[in-house]
Amino acid sequence: MAKKGAGATRGISPVRPTRALPIGAYLKVADNSGAKVIQIIGVVGYKGTRRRLAAAGVGDMVVATVKKGRPDMRHQVVRAVVVRQRKEYRRLDGMRVKFEDNAAAIVTPEGVPRGTEIRGAIAREAAERWVRLGSIASIVL
């Protein structure tokens, strides 16, 4: 069994937020990487049931295409981490959390952010799982 805190930089979180963003969902981009809107085309590490669309939640890494943004960013396939979702989820202390939009931050395949700042709040679950995102975020809720 894994120790608490093991893998804090990538991947392990004691909270499993509701996966509310299926393939095809559009997300706002919360950082200054040059993309404005992305569409999910895959979820990294998702193991699901046959014929079921993969879905992502807060803290999950997704594969997405850039739909709106700078001309050099458009139509690129990128990796991103979901930092906000509208569907509420429950934390271990009983608090329910939801945000006003669905948003993600563009990262490299290793999890290093491509932008230098994140606009708006990001979820604590995403900041704990992806420490580099938490360090450039303006607010962590």
Curated annotation (Swiss-Prot):
**HAMAP family, per database record:** Ribosomal_uL14
Q: Name one Pfam family in it.
A: Ribosomal_L14
Q: Give the multimer and partner information.
A: Part of the 50S ribosomal subunit. Forms a cluster with proteins L3 and L24e, part of which may contact the 16S rRNA in 2 intersubunit bridges.
For this protein, the record's NCBIfam families field holds:
PRK08571.1 (NF006344), uL14_arch (TIGR03673)
Record's function text: Binds to 23S rRNA. Forms part of two intersubunit bridges in the 70S ribosome.
Instruction: Supply the alphabetized keyword list.
Output: Ribonucleoprotein, Ribosomal protein, RNA-binding, rRNA-binding
Q: From which domain of life does this come?
A: Archaea
Organism expressing this protein natively: Thermococcus kodakarensis (strain ATCC BAA-918 / JCM 12380 / KOD1) (Pyrococcus kodakaraensis (strain KOD1))
User: GO MF annotations for this entry?
Assistant: large ribosomal subunit rRNA binding; structural constituent of ribosome
Q: Kindly provide the name given to this protein in its UniProt entry.
A: Large ribosomal subunit protein uL14
Any one of the GO CC terms: cytosolic large ribosomal subunit
GO BP terms in the entry = translation
Entry annotated with the keyword Flavoprotein: no
The family annotation for this protein states: Belongs to the universal ribosomal protein uL14 family.
